[in-house]
Amino acid sequence: MSSSSSWRRAATVMLAAGWTHSSPAGFRLLLLQRAQNQRFLPGAHVFPGGVLDAADSSPDWVRLFAPRHTPPRFGLGPEPPRQPPFPGLSHGDADPAALPDDVALRICAIREAFEEAGVLLLRPRDAAPASQEPSQALSPPAGLAEWRSRVRSDPRCFLQLCAHLDCTPDIWALHDWGGWLTPYGRTIRRFDTTFFLCCLRDIPRVEPDVAEVVGYQWLSPSEATECFLSKEIWLAPPQFYEMRRLENFASLSALYRFCSDRPSEVPEKWLPIILLTSDGTIHLLPGDELYVKDSDFLEKNMSTDKKTEEIVKEGKVLNRVVIHSPYVYEIYMTLPSENKHVYPRNYIVNKRCTAHL
């Protein structure tokens, strides 16, 4: 059984920015390439994000948000319903003085976007309430490199940076999107990661952290899928799945409206259960007829002597990612959305690279 200490809480932000160049796609997403020496997902292209630090939930943030925004929600609106915990997944008793989880996780994602990409998702403390349109990253001020080094060394310095700039983290620009838990067996490190979506009017300047990040690209969801299939980039199954979701939106404004208008529901948080077939691997997701929400499968995989094709043909109620090889995934989905979310768009590349809806 996984103890609470073996799961590291994390947050990631999918940055979707407007694209002014001539192109049929209306927005691009920031993907960072992780260095090969990283223990988790070496070489992968990922969204900015990282592990939650105690500094992200510090009550010291309250003074920075004051007087315009007051605890506990700081103007975020009603607290979203809580998802029942997975068996064996508990984060223990929270400090009663700490910020609410969804505030702290937003600060974490914003801090990591600065550390990894040099993007400042901040807004002036005296700014008017957020307008009903995509946000804008803060222009990098002088001396930012030194601050970035300090924040990387000590996350508590992010609060000091915000105070120095007389800004607050733009937590209102981050919309709930979903969450993923690392499946058993992929790595000794397992993460409970909350995904946020942030729409930006313009593409901000990016300066990758050369220690953890060796490159970056702004790609539309369809471009990212094509680059993955052509082996130009590698995406882990959660990132691939989210890219396919985002193909539902033709423009930044459509994506922003969806995020803004989506009612507060129990946020998705999915723990893939791995089914090992005789010739491949299937990541079973909640709702799939073979998915077993049982504590036994937190620490082991399922297996069968059947081939992948047999398993797929037998299924009727599906929510799964079939892994044929590192660069050939298939998404099978027959479920209606239970929480007003979108599911991966039907997008045919070739016979072996099809999202089945």
UniProtKB/Swiss-Prot annotation:
Signal peptide: none annotated. Changing R39A: No significant effect on Km for CoA. Highly expressed in the kidneys, with lower levels in skeletal muscle and brain (at protein level). Keywords: Hydrolase, Magnesium, Manganese, Metal-binding, Peroxisome. GO terms for molecular function: coenzyme A diphosphatase activity; magnesium ion binding. It catalyses: an acyl-CoA + H2O = an acyl-4'-phosphopantetheine + adenosine 3',5'-bisphosphate + 2 H(+); CoA + H2O = (R)-4'-phosphopantetheine + adenosine 3',5'-bisphosphate + 2 H(+); hexanoyl-CoA + H2O = hexanoyl-4'-phosphopantetheine + adenosine 3',5'-bisphosphate + 2 H(+); octanoyl-CoA + H2O = S-octanoyl-4'-phosphopantetheine + adenosine 3',5'-bisphosphate + 2 H(+). Optimum pH is 9.0. Its EC number is 3.6.1.-, 3.6.1.77. It is found in: Peroxisome. Residues 10-242 form the Nudix hydrolase domain. The modification N6-succinyllysine is found at K300. Residues 78-87 have a biased composition (Pro residues). A motif (Microbody targeting signal) lies at residues 355-357. A motif (Nudix box) lies at residues 97-118. The record marks R34, F40, L41, R189 as: Important for coenzyme A binding. Inhibited by chenodeoxycholic acid (CDCA) and its conjugated derivatives, taurochenodeoxycholic acid and glycochenodeoxycholic acid. Inhibited by fluoride. Induction: By testosterone. Its cofactor is Mg(2+); Mn(2+). SUPFAM superfamilies: Nudix. Disruption phenotype: Mice exhibit a significant 20% increase in total CoA levels in kidney. Residues 72-93 are annotated as: Disordered. Fatty acyl-coenzyme A (CoA) diphosphatase that hydrolyzes fatty acyl-CoA to yield acyl-4'-phosphopantetheine and adenosine 3',5'-bisphosphate. Mediates the hydrolysis of a wide range of CoA esters, including choloyl-CoA and branched-chain fatty-acyl-CoA esters and at low substrate concentrations medium and long-chain fatty-acyl-CoA esters are the primary substrates. Highest activity seen with medium-chain acyl-CoA esters and higher rates of activity seen with the unsaturated acyl-CoA esters compared with the saturated esters. Exhibits decapping activity towards dpCoA-capped RNAs in vitro. Monomer. This is Acyl-coenzyme A diphosphatase NUDT19. It comes from Mus musculus (Mouse). The lineage of its organism: Eukaryota, Metazoa, Chordata, Craniata, Vertebrata.
